[in-house]
Amino acid sequence: MNLNKTAIVTLLSLATLIGFGGSAIAQNAMGTHMNGDGTDMSHSQGKYSGKNSMANLTTEQQAIRQQVLNEFQASTADMRQQLTSKNYEYKALLTSKPVDEQKVLAVSKEIQTLRDSLYQRRVSMDTQLAKAGIAMTGNHGSRGGNHMGMAGGRGCR
């Protein structure tokens, strides 16, 4: 009788674990950085702009757009790396004991300066594309747009 109780409890525990585990995996398939169609949004311009974002552009416009985007990525690579480093430094300062409010404030100002510079470069890129007759694709203000407003950004800081 004791063996039967142990076997039943073990089987029920295993079934529960498998049931809840499968449910957790199924719900976690689409994280906050994923589009509804399961594609990664980290380099896209919005939810509906994936592979077909340049479908309405001529071959010349596609080449110009790609060149401008490549130039933007190359020209802002160091700035984006600095921004990442400053964000890590900011988080480290907030978790240090005691918290040095002056250092935190100074780093936050550096972060804001980098963000402003990056945004100005983005505006220049958008202007360059507009002058070439290439409309912006995607959603630049929310959920995955490169301007990262609303839920696509990292929240308030």
UniProtKB/Swiss-Prot annotation:
Keyword Zinc listed: yes
GO cellular component, one term: periplasmic space
Signal peptide (from-to): 1-26
Compartments where found: Periplasm
Keywords associated with the record: Periplasm, Signal, Stress response, Zinc
Pfam families given in the database record: Metal_resist (PF13801)
Purpose: Part of the Zra signaling pathway, an envelope stress response (ESR) system composed of the periplasmic accessory protein ZraP, the histidine kinase ZraS and the transcriptional regulator ZraR. The ZraPSR system contributes to antibiotic resistance and is important for membrane integrity in the presence of membrane-targeting biocides. ZraP acts as a modulator which has both a regulatory and a chaperone function. The zinc-bound form of ZraP modulates the response of the ZraPSR system by inhibiting the expression of the zra genes, probably by interacting with ZraS.
Protein name: Signaling pathway modulator ZraP
